[in-house]
């Protein structure tokens, strides 16, 4: 979205051609691949880093890993979000109450502490260990509605170049 469709297609082709292996596995598998020297760099969600720190078997994999945040000289790193919506629900009012609870300060503190994710409620801070890792990083402020408008284009490009193949 920041550079245009032509740039994105060229970038994705170069990324695919530079992969150490066909895309596979989950976030933990990507870190394990670095540890096993299958690749030098992988993409994953930051909160898995913290989950792995608390697992003695996986903690050793982190000896070869350092979280980095790309695009720091420009628009910053993309941040995933967790979303929630109500669709065809007979209990609409209770659903709204549940969403309001999930967004509350108390629930967001639980979420941030349990998962090491960024809370959406501005009254709640991320955990100190998350803040220490992301210290100084900038994050992409692109409106998610705008970002979502590129989904079809992105999917078409990924299919066109057979990214997963």
Place the predicted regions along the sequence by residue:
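Ligand-binding pocket segment of bilobal, Venus flytrap-like solute-binding proteins
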Residues: 1-68
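Soluble non-cytosolic domains of exported or imported proteins
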Residues: 6, 25-28, 43, 89-93, ...
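Non-transmembrane alpha-helical segments in soluble domains
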Residues: 12, 31, 35, 43, ...
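Residues that form or immediately flank small-molecule/cofactor binding pockets and catalytic motifs
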Residues: 29, 70-73, 116
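Short beta-strand->loop
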Residues: 59-78, 87-89
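Mature extracytoplasmic/periplasmic domains
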Residues: 82-141
């Amino acid at each position: 979205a920041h550079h245009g469709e032509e740039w994105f297609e060229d970038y994705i082709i170069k990324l695919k051609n530079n992969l150490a292996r066909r895309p596979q596995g989950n976030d933990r598998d990507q870190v394990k691949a670095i540890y096993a020297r299958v690749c030098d760099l992988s993409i994953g969600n930051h909160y898995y880093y913290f989950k792995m720190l608390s697992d003695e078997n996986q903690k050793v994999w982190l000896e070869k890993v350092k979280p980095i945040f790309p695009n720091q000289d420009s628009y910053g790193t993309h941040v995933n979000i967790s979303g929630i919506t109500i669709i065809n629900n007979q209990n609409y009012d209770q659903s709204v109450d549940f969403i309001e609870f999930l967004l509350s300060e108390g629930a967001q503190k639980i979420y941030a502490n349990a998962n090491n994710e960024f809370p959406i409620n501005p009254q709640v801070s991320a955990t100190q260990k998350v803040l220490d890792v992301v210290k100084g990083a900038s994050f992409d402020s692109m409106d998610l509605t705008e970002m979502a408008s590129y989904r079809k284009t992105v999917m078409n490009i990924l299919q066109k170049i057979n990214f997963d193949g």
